[in-house]
């Protein structure tokens, strides 16, 4: 199996790059994020590779990091997630963002990926929630805060601040992370307006 390719970018397709390795052109399918970060044609690059072998084809998938490749593999352990959906998820969320979204139960962020509806998003969160921290570090305080919000046991100012940030268009996981950071600086007795202000400052960094 091919585990890594290093060569010169020959050309790009809609969802793949042709990588010239010593005169052999390899068609490597990538997430939109990975394709955006690759250099223009004629420049050298390298990709971690996942080789998928099926009865009628052999297809290569490329990643900028081993973490992205590990998530590609992990996502496909969930029923209903194939290579296309896995790449779609990695196109809208970085590995660390994906880990945080799943660990905090942010089904809305997961459902932003093409081909992921509410039911599949819920299944991804349910099946991978305990595995996510092993693939990317997730702040335990953030997980506890998300759990408290979901269980409606979080202090009202915290819940109000997170709700306000979500209403402004921020994903649930980002809003929770920002409010968690705001709590650390403002203290547990902070009012919602203070948490919102500090949370927005955190999100603007």
Swiss-Prot record:
Source organism superkingdom: Bacteria
GO molecular function: ATP binding; four-way junction DNA binding; four-way junction helicase activity
GO BP field: DNA recombination; DNA repair
UniProt keyword annotations, A-Z: Cytoplasm, DNA damage, DNA recombination, DNA repair, DNA-binding
TM region(s), chain numbering: none
Region (Domain III): 153-205
Region (Domain I): 1-64
InterPro entries for the chain: DNA_helicase_Holl-junc_RuvA_I, NA-bd_OB-fold, RuvA, RuvA_2-like, RuvA_C, RuvA_C_sf
Keyword DNA damage in annotation: yes
SUPFAM superfamilies with a match to the protein in the record: DNA helicase RuvA subunit, C-terminal domain, Nucleic acid-binding proteins, RuvA domain 2-like
GO CC term (a single one): Holliday junction resolvase complex
Keyword Transferase: no
Subcellular location: Cytoplasm
Span list, region Domain II: 65-143
Principal location listed in the UniProt entry: cytoplasm
Region (Flexible linker): 144-152
Any Pfam family: HHH_5
Subunit structure: Homotetramer. Forms an RuvA(8)-RuvB(12)-Holliday junction (HJ) complex. HJ DNA is sandwiched between 2 RuvA tetramers; dsDNA enters through RuvA and exits via RuvB. An RuvB hexamer assembles on each DNA strand where it exits the tetramer. Each RuvB hexamer is contacted by two RuvA subunits (via domain III) on 2 adjacent RuvB subunits; this complex drives branch migration. In the full resolvosome a probable DNA-RuvA(4)-RuvB(12)-RuvC(2) complex forms which resolves the HJ.
Free-text comment about domains: Has three domains with a flexible linker between the domains II and III and assumes an 'L' shape. Domain III is highly mobile and contacts RuvB.
Biological role stated in the UniProt entry: The RuvA-RuvB-RuvC complex processes Holliday junction (HJ) DNA during genetic recombination and DNA repair, while the RuvA-RuvB complex plays an important role in the rescue of blocked DNA replication forks via replication fork reversal (RFR). RuvA specifically binds to HJ cruciform DNA, conferring on it an open structure. The RuvB hexamer acts as an ATP-dependent pump, pulling dsDNA into and through the RuvAB complex. HJ branch migration allows RuvC to scan DNA until it finds its consensus sequence, where it cleaves and resolves the cruciform DNA.
HAMAP family named in the record: DNA_HJ_migration_RuvA
Family: Belongs to the RuvA family.
This protein's name: Holliday junction branch migration complex subunit RuvA
Organism: Methylobacterium sp. (strain 4-46)
